[in-house]
Amino acid sequence: MPPKNKEKGKKSGAQKKKKNWGADVVAESRHRLVVLEKELLRDHLALRRDEARRAKASEDQLRQRLQGVEAELEGARSEGKAIYAEMSRQCHALQEDMQTRSKQLEEEVKGLRGQLEACQREAAAAREEAEQALGERDQALAQLRAHMADMEAKYEEILHDSLDRLLAKLRAIKQQWDGAALRLHARHKEQQRQFGLTPPGSLRPPAPSL
């Protein structure tokens, strides 16, 4: 094989290696993107479950306390009515005591309701933060996808540019090789003519290979 063909084989192998390297980089980037999406989705779902569980537990606890206080208030009122009916002499004192107790219980109920509303506001704020985190994740994924698309375009541009340069070099080498073959053929033909020989048909110039 001529030296030029050996050089052509080496360059072709280097070109294939460079193309495979670019494909490996793109595949690895896509794999990392998929892993990142799964991790972010898992973290987001875990956060939402924890927040919902805490909010539900707080709401149930406050509701139970509220029901207990309301039951106690109703029992106190019923007890006051029974005492008033049975003990008229202590009616006024018991009324004052029950009214005071009722006010205290009502204040406690009011405070518990305020705590319940605060808990609901905190749950709403937690949901808003989770939605914001999800939006930031989507934005980060969009930026990563755009970066990957830009990388793919650059790799494709580099590959095409390398192929164009390689083809240009091969064309230049072919022209040099064809010119040398033609000159060698003409020289052999002239030498045979000098010795009175007829050039055989096998000494025709080589046909172009590109």
Swiss-Prot record:
The keyword Coiled coil applies. Keywords: Cell projection, Cilium, Coiled coil, Cytoplasm, Cytoskeleton, Flagellum. It is found in: Cytoplasm, Cytoskeleton, Flagellum axoneme. GO terms for molecular function: identical protein binding. InterPro entries: DRC12-like. It comes from the Eukaryota. Residues 7-20 have a biased composition (Basic residues). One of its GO terms (cellular component) is cytoskeleton. Residues 1-23, 188-210 are annotated as: Disordered. Residues 49-161 form a coiled coil. The keyword Cytoplasm applies. Belongs to the DRC12 family. Component of the nexin-dynein regulatory complex (N-DRC), a key regulator of ciliary/flagellar motility which maintains the alignment and integrity of the distal axoneme and regulates microtubule sliding in motile axonemes. Component of the nexin-dynein regulatory complex (N-DRC). This is Dynein regulatory complex protein 12. It comes from Homo sapiens (Human).
